[in-house]
Amino acid sequence: MAQNLPTIALLATGGTIAGSGVDASLGSYKSGELGVKELLKAIPSLNKIARIQGEQVSNIGSQDMNEEIWFKLAQRAQELLDDSRIQGVVITHGTDTLEESAYFLNLVLHSTKPVVLVGAMRNASSLSADGALNLYYAVSVAVNEKSANKGVLVVMDDTIFRVREVVKTHTTHISTFKALNSGAIGSVYYGKTRYYMQPLRKHTTESEFSLSQLKTPLPKVDIIYTHAGMTPDLFQASLNSHAKGVVIAGVGNGNVSAGFLKAMQEASQMGVVIVRSSRVGSGGVTSGEIDDKAYGFITSDNLNPQKARVLLQLALTKTNDKAKIQEMFEEY
């Protein structure tokens, strides 16, 4: 029977889903304690829906995720996706930076096959740990034919998300992941997958970014978080460290103080690419109080600062033309 089942490649990177603690009733634990074999051993029912080919890419807390692992993960995922024997790829990942890794993969992988990222909010030794069921659901989504050509997906807490929209919204709740601007793309319940919408922004096979043309390190892009009474000091420090681009997590509709705005304009005139995003959890950034064309700024649409940074890093490998980069933010 197993020979007739689809083959899913499981790439493990660590995180809470692979974490372990001493006391099941306490919140303290260490991420990345369990290897991929131990994860699979805890879910024997996976063998009823797929043949799992597991590999360990890294075993870290996702606060330590970096470009080097991104490239290693993406290259291995692409190799597996190009293998006709593999139906899809599932990636276990810590939740802290999951949305950034997922968006990077959504822009650089080229395949119509399902790619699903999954994590957990409670470590494997916790009371009512959520990782095992989340992983079972992620594999269920990956083996479903309707999951093809939807770009990279995130599965958490019975819910299927497009990676462009998904964001972590709570530090501890298992329902932390939300798509605040557009809603979830579908749901999964004990293996039954349902979709309600189709991604419209460019992803995977439509993307102009290719792993074969990229190299690490990517162009340096910083995020500057603004606040009342903000001065340009941190922004200037970013420029002094040779940032090629800066994403501004502005207040409200991506706004900044008058003094900060002047510093941004001067940097833009020197060739630094400035993207205005927002520290607000939802909504888009538009040219309202700030005339972005006149200042030479780019608006992030409704991409949050961390995803805007990923897109800008990749965009800068292609061009420094601000009009073209603005188009990318409207297309991806």
From Swiss-Prot:
Ranges that cross the membrane: none
Disulphide-bonded residues: none
Catalytic activity: L-asparagine + H2O = L-aspartate + NH4(+)
Locations listed in the record: Cytoplasm
Record-listed substrate binding positions: S62, T95, D96
Record-level GO BP terms: asparagine metabolic process
Name recorded for this polypeptide: Probable L-asparaginase
Biological source species: Helicobacter pylori (strain J99 / ATCC 700824)
Lineage: Bacteria, Pseudomonadati, Campylobacterota, Epsilonproteobacteria, Campylobacterales
